[in-house]
């Protein structure tokens, strides 16, 4: 239950009872009415701009209209107090009874509390990671992996039908470079002294096992073949080996995909899917033959000073038209992008989200143009760019990895600090902002370490249940009707403040899903944990506020209901971030 949605309905119903509003209803835009928490919690529980929004079309002073609305809202039994502020904002304070009923609902719904139908089952494709299958995942992939996975989890929680997808870039020239790199490791496994890995190839030790596997399978057979024979053989096995490694890296980070889509699929059967996509754009009038003027600055890889087959992407929002077929008849990488988008669109996705690194910023306009051209405006494509992650240890930059050759691997980071720390911290800053990740900071057991602070809140909730069992040995906690127990008992202002913080969860879910910003969940969880820890600490000085009071069984049981609600939301939120909710922490 979203209390802000509930009161939006109540406020609009109150407006419908005002004569002048009814008379001019067709001229009023109720969609502009906002209902949200006041900026200052001391002003109330719910605030609305209704009077500000409607005063002009009604020809009234906002403050005067606010007073009329207030009179109607005062008739609501769940409104304890309502007042106007500033030029016409309305602040509402809710009754204790309303909070108690809402808490009972939270307890009854458990981990379902906060789930939304705002997505209405709409199909959404979220593509993330999509790292080249040329080596282990590095820390640069880590942020996009976590952001994409958490966003997909969030959208699913908000009622969207989500597909998590990984695009395997296995058709480009980098795959031939990989195969040649593996061939050197294969020769090395046969006993050759290969010396230093040539420039332009992948030097990492991670290719050694692949070379050894080939030596076991083929012996010296491949060594005697010309490159055109051994290259496709090694290419296939190298891709498979790299994807096994990448999948293991993703699993270590608790990142999952529903679909792994191979770029080679687009090039199969004479590049049938690419040809179909280009034919479709041709039919729609977006394809022509021509030569592009040389762009300013550095020339892109696909630019040629001769006639090519071009996508008229400037007609759909791009800066320049894009080559689809080169003068030699070969397809550009961009042509595969077009075919891949069309494939997703043909699979029924009208909303697609691409999670890319900040270095792909130049791709945004062209991808958006593809979406408009292929779908004729029927599909929405959003590109979310993740800024760089810099690694530190006690404030000092972390050195590169010997195993990978020139970068820090994702597995190294996860093995050192744990996947929960990695995942939560990758979400503890907006993805469009750079992130500094300090190994020392993320392993601290303090309030300054967000993942510890939030997980400790859940563990503390569980410890309170164990404490209650010790205080009341005959109590069968598992069979308690905690939702019923809170009625008429939970009433202390400090307790109600905690209930109010829990009650924000459904609104946070919907807002974060609609903004496609999973970091909002991490921020909210920290705030909830802070409120909970703060209330727990008050109990150390004020025994009457302790969650378990061995002299008051009824109150203790009711407060277990409050703890249950906190724990449920923490667990749900941590689940969205892909982070564990431990029952104990040592």
Curated annotation (Swiss-Prot):
It is found in: Cytoplasm. Its main location: cytoplasm. GO terms for biological process: arginyl-tRNA aminoacylation. Monomer. It comes from Rhizobium rhizogenes (strain K84 / ATCC BAA-868). InterPro entries: aa-tRNA-synth_I_CS, Arg-tRNA-ligase, Arg-tRNA-synth_N, Arg-tRNA-synth_N_sf, ArgRS_core, DALR_anticod-bd, Rossmann-like_a/b/a_fold, tRNAsynth_Ia_anticodon-bd. Its EC number is 6.1.1.19. CDD domains: ArgRS_core. This is Arginine--tRNA ligase. The keyword Lyase does not apply. It holds the Pfam family DALR_1. GO terms for cellular component: cytoplasm. One of its GO terms (molecular function) is arginine-tRNA ligase activity. It catalyses: tRNA(Arg) + L-arginine + ATP = L-arginyl-tRNA(Arg) + AMP + diphosphate. Keywords: Aminoacyl-tRNA synthetase, ATP-binding, Cytoplasm, Ligase, Nucleotide-binding, Protein biosynthesis. The keyword Kinase does not apply. SUPFAM superfamilies: Anticodon-binding domain of a subclass of class I aminoacyl-tRNA synthetases, Arginyl-tRNA synthetase (ArgRS), N-terminal 'additional' domain, Nucleotidylyl transferase. HAMAP family: Arg_tRNA_synth. A motif ('HIGH' region) lies at residues 131-141. Belongs to the class-I aminoacyl-tRNA synthetase family.
């Amino acid at each position: 239950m979203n209390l802000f949605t509930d009161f939006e309905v109540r406020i609009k119903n109150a407006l419908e009872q005002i004569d002048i509003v009814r008379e001019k209803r067709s001229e009023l835009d109720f969609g502009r009415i906002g209902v949200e928490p006041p900026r200052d919690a001391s002003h109330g529980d719910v605030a609305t701009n209704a009077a500000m929004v409607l005063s002009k079309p009604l020809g009234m002073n906002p403050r005067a209209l606010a007073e009329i609305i207030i009179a109607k809202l005062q008739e609501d039994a769940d409104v304890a107090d309502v007042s106007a502020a500033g030029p016409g904002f309305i602040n509402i304070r809710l009754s204790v009874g309303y909070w108690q009923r809402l808490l009972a609902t939270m307890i009854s719904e458990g981990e379902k509390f906060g789930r939304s139908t705002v997505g209405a089952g709409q199909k959404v494709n979220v593509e993330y990671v999509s790292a080249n299958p040329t080596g282990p995942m590095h820390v640069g992939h880590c942020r996009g992996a976590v952001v994409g996975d958490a966003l997909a989890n969030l959208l699913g929680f908000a009622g969207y039908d989500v597909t998590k997808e990984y695009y395997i870039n296995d058709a480009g020239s980098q795959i031939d470079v990989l195969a040649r790199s593996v061939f050197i490791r294969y020769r090395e496994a046969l006993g050759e002294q290969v010396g230093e890995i040539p420039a332009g190839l992948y030097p990492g030790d991670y290719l050694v096992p692949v070379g050894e596997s080939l030596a076991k399978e083929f012996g010296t057979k491949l060594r005697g073949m010309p490159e055109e024979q051994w290259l496709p053989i090694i290419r296939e096995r190298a891709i498979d080996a790299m994807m096994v490694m990448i999948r293991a890296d993703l699993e270590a980070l608790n990142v999952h995909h529903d679909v792994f889509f191979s770029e080679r699929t687009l090039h199969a059967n004479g590049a049938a899917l690419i040809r179909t996509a280009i034919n479709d754009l041709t039919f729609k009038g977006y394809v022509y033959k021509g030569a592009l003027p040389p762009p300013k600055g550095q020339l892109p890889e696909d630019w040629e000073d001769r006639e090519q087959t071009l996508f008229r992407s400037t007609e759909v929002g791009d800066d320049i038209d894009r080559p689809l077929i080169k003068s030699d008849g070969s397809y550009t990488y961009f042509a595969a992008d077009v075919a891949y988008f069309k494939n997703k669109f043909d699979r029924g996705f009208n909303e697609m989200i691409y999670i890319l690194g900040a270095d792909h910023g130049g791709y945004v306009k062209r991808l958006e143009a593809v979406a408009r051209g292929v779908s004729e405006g029927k599909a929405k494509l959003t590109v979310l760019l993740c800024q760089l992650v810099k690694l530190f240890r006690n404030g000092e930059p972390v050195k590169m990895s010997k195993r990978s050759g020139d970068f820090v691997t994702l597995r190294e980071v996860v093995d050192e600090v744990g996947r929960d720390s990695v995942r939560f911290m990758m979400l503890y800053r907006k993805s469009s902002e750079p992130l500094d990740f300090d190994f020392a900071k993320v392993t601290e057991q303090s309030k300054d370490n967000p993942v510890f602070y939030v997980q400790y809140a859940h563990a503390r909730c569980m410890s309170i249940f164990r404490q209650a069992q010790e205080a009341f040995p005959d109590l069968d906690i598992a069979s308690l009707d905690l939702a019923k127990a809170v009625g008429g008992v939970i009433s202390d202002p400090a307790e109600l403040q905690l209930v109010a913080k829990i009650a924000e969860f459904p609104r946070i879910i919907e807002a974060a899903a609609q903004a496609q910003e999973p970091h909002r969940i991490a921020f909210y969880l920290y705030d909830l944990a802070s409120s909970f820890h703060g209330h727990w600490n008050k109990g150390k000085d004020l025994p009457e506020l302790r969650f378990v009071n061995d002299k008051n069984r009824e109150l203790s049981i009711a407060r277990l209901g409050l703890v249950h609600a906190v724990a449920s939301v923490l667990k749900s939120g941590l689940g969205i971030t892909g982070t564990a909710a431990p029952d104990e922490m040592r």
